[in-house]
Amino acid sequence: MNIKHLLFFIGIGILTSCGNSDVIPVSKYYDYDHEIPLQETVKLITDTTDYKIYDVTYRSVHNKRVTALLTVPKNITEPFKVIILQHGKGDRKTVDYIEFGNEYFYKNGYAVLRLDASNHGDRIENEFDFDFRGKHKYWTRNIITQTVFDLRRAVDFIEKREELDQNNIGFFGISMGGISGAIFCGVDQRVKVPVLVLAGGQLNLMFGAKALTSDTNDYLSIIEPMNFIEQIAPRPLLMINGENDELVLPMMSKLLYKKAEKPKNIIWYPAKHHDMPLEEVYMEGTKWFDEYLK
């Protein structure tokens, strides 16, 4: 696809996605019954001089069981400000870059709740190909939508914990975690400060010649970050992206950022998708949380 065709698809695609979000209230898809019992379990598994880690499970929408870890710092006054930390596609709540972030955040005084995305980590049920265009495309889409529900139920869990500050919840999502996080933070106003890393919008650009069909736009409508990103305002949004990202193209990140309302900021690193400078990325996220979680 040459650049002229790509720009044409982008221009028409933006109009199409905007039109769909106006006509169809896609955010209503993520409504659910808050009063359904969480049936949560919380078990202490690590206790050190600096922090505690709890193994957590809870009941989500569609009767799914979510597996998570809650880290709480010691020697800090409760209730703790809390960060929901979400991994990317194919990974789990204990993958190295999430472990790094967990340690970085609790050392800066935050509690951290990290969960396995739908059909990831301890929650794997099927191992089909994750592909928006393949024969398992609806199964793939359901992973995103279910994770959004799971994240909303994570906030329900936080609200039940006396040691966690339900009025100071941040979100830090990476790659697929950032894409699902854009939807989650758009539909759930209880998240005070979102940070989206390696996320982008206009997902129909992945569909080539089929990018502009009504079937494609209908299929993507409930997982298209462009349909939700405006709802984050007036909460402060930080995006962090790679200038050489080969998976979430920089153009997709720029489109998502442009669609977002102020207050917002975006930080770029000269990096590909899998070689972002982790410490700098988490440092910038922590600075954002320090400024706005008050």
Which residues does each PLM region occupy?
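N-terminal cap/lid segment of alpha/beta-hydrolase-fold proteins
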Residues: 34-77
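Cap/lid segment of the alpha/beta-hydrolase catalytic domain
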Residues: 90-149, 206-209
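Primarily recognizes the serine-hydrolase "nucleophile elbow" in alpha/beta-hydrolase
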Residues: 149-214
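Short beta-strand/loop motif that positions the catalytic acidic residue
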Residues: 232, 238-241, 245
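Acidic catalytic loop of the alpha/beta-hydrolase fold
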Residues: 243-248, 275
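Short alpha-helix in the alpha/beta-hydrolase fold that links the catalytic acid
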Residues: 249-257
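Histidine-bearing beta->alpha loop at or near hydrolase active sites
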Residues: 269-276
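Post-His helix in hydrolase/transferase enzymes
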Residues: 277-288
